[in-house]
Swiss-Prot record:
Protein name stated in the entry: Rubrerythrin
Residues covered by the Rubredoxin-like domain: 157-195
Pfam family, one: Rubrerythrin
Residues that hold Fe(3+) 1 according to the record: 20, 53, 101, 132
Function summary: May provide oxidative stress protection via catalytic reduction of intracellular hydrogen peroxide.
Quaternary context: Homodimer. Possesses two rubredoxin-like centers and two non-sulfur oxo-bridged di-iron centers per dimer.
Binding residue positions for Fe(3+) 2: 53, 98, 132, 135
Compartments reported by the entry: Cytoplasm
GO CC term (a single one): cytoplasm
Transmembrane segments: none
CDD domains, per the entry: rubredoxin_SM, Rubrerythrin
């Protein structure tokens, strides 16, 4: 790959690295809020997504490290300030950020990388935008579940799994506490085997 030094692509990679690092940290904050509010599954999803963001940051940083080791890349960018409020607000805020990355930021950064002759970087931006699409969709579904009171209650009978002990409960609603380990309803999530 040719040198990134002095290119707009290098700036975009560093902006993306910084943005992904900040998203990761915000998601860990949001995870704590969700857990405190009794949404253990949503807390875990925020942590999982935070780890995904770390890997995105790593991918962007590796392009820079491989070519610009020991140098500084100056950027001028704005990043949102959103301290955790409540889980519903945090999910909507997170979805908004993911949507901006998948629909505006990363497609435009991919186009610049293509124009500057960095097809591998362009491909990375496009593939990571696809991952951000999954994050966006997941956050929106979780927000809708909270809004509709369907985190622990469904319209039909489903299997619920206690995230603490693995107990499986069948019903339209998760039990208020696990009959096996006595952990609260917060630990239940819809159970579906995907293997």
């Amino acid at each position: 790959m040719k040198s990134l030094k002095g290119t707009k692509t290098a700036e975009n990679l560093m902006k993306s690295f910084a943005g992904e690092c900040q998203a990761r940290t915000r998601y860990t904050y949001f995870s704590s809020t969700a857990r405190k509010e009794g949404y253990v599954q949503i807390s875990n999803i925020f942590l999982e997504t935070a780890e995904n963001e770390k890997e995105h940051a790593k991918r962007f940083y590796k392009f820079l490290k491989d070519d610009l080791q020991g140098e500084a890349v100056e950027i001028n960018a704005a990043y949102p300030v959103e301290l955790p409020t409540d889980t519903l607000t945090n999910l909507k805020f997170a979805a908004e950020g993911e949507h901006d990355e998948l629909s505006n930021l990363y497609p435009s950064f991919a186009d610049v990388a293509d124009e500057e002759g960095f097809p591998e970087v362009a491909a990375a931006f496009r593939m990571i935008a696809k991952a951000e699409t999954a994050h966006y969709n997941r956050f929106m579904k979780l927000a809708k579940n909270i809004e509709e009171g369907k985190v622990f209650k469904k319209d039909e009978v489903v299997l619920w799994k206690c995230g603490n002990c693995g107990f499986i409960w069948e019903g339209a609603e998760a039990p208020l506490k696990c009959p096996a380990c006595l952990h609260p309803q917060a630990y239940f999530e819809v159970f579906k085997e995907t293997y």
